Amino acid sequence: LLLGTIFNVFWLYRMRRQLQMKWYAVLILSVLHTAIGVCSVKVFAFLESGDIGNMSLFGGVFFMPAAYWLGAKLTKRPYWKVCDVLTPCMLFTLMCARINCIVSGCCSGLVIPGTHVHFPTRELEILYYIVMLILLIPRVKKSKNPGSIYPLYMASYGAFRFLDEFFR
């Protein structure tokens, strides 16, 4: 979480002009983004399993856009711009969460038949996030196709997870 928040600070500081933010707002938004993200994964896990101790990364994927919408309305900024700038923050934080899955030993893939080795589903998801960050960050910086960043992420993530779930 700390690593994700630090990334958010650096990324949002670079992008503060697009969202017309003061430097201190970058710090507040970075911490809020992480806190809302944690609440999102906890709430979604509770809705899925009834257990508040679990986490589900789908919470971040599905609830964060609602938080972005609320933030855009409260600060009178275009929703598409808020989504474009904050999507890399969400991607990086989700990537850190998957790294935590490796460290804690959860979310491993199915055992490969005839071996004791698991399919590297967590590792593939981390690789997916790295590739998406490499592809999306330049698009956000150049404001290429405004408003397309989050939908592009969702479409690719949906396709990735559809395939990944066969091995989870």
Regions picked out by a protein language model, each given a short descriptive name:
Residues L1-R168:
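Hydrophobic, membrane-interfacing alpha helices
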